[in-house]
Amino acid sequence: LLEAIRPLVEAKKYEFVVFDSHKYGTVDALFEFLANVDVIMGPHGGAFYNMIFMRRGTTVIEFMPRSPSFHSTAEAVHLIFYLQASLLGDKYYSVVSGGSGSNMDVDVAVVKEILKDSLLCVCL
């Protein structure tokens, strides 16, 4: 996935960053980084809570397991990031992904289409 989307992101003149929390020694440094994020994407998990520190209108792409419990209103806790993004005015996309455990099969074409629609060209 990363190899497939990097050229698209860089062609639109955006910086492509794979987040590593160890690079930010202070909360202030982390918040400064997050305030400049245009797109956050990854598998469903607690790191998405950081979207609260991002600009309004950030694009959120969440990879959701195909498991029925993740798509049931009886298990609505899994909808928390959709709800948070909606309340913050962010653009939310859920990409249902197969696989098991920590390995997910993400549809690269779907992610590329979302990025094409979400990233504006900042070409000079």
Listing of model-derived features with the role each one plays in the protein:
Residues L1-L124:
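N-terminal targeting/anchoring "stem" of glycan-biosynthesis enzymes
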